[in-house]
């Protein structure tokens, strides 16, 4: 769900918010797989945020199975229990690199003991700020620096 994001959005008044999610797939995968599965509803998620005080006009939604990911320069990207946890970071690697700028931050959950070349490539572009270790994953926080 989007409870963490709601608390963040209420505290920090972002000018642009992009929600990306696959809304429906034939299968629902609950471990780590090469492809992500979807069972979200972006319209309901946006409505939840709007009903809790986030302005509708700042929120864009995108289902990458239905539409092309928009160009969207970001300051902060959050992927909790999704990219890196259920599927490889490779899925969004190029998008993240192309749409980040100096000082962009990325926070995501990396499943332990799983090889993920996208995660390794992100570490070449971003500097790790913090890692919080959990039982099955590490929560990774990184920042993009010049010339990295």
Task: Locate predicted features.
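Short "lid" loop at the C-terminus of a central beta-strand within the Rossmann-like core
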Residues: 23-26, 83-85, 111-116
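Core SAM-dependent methyltransferase catalytic element
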Residues: 120-148
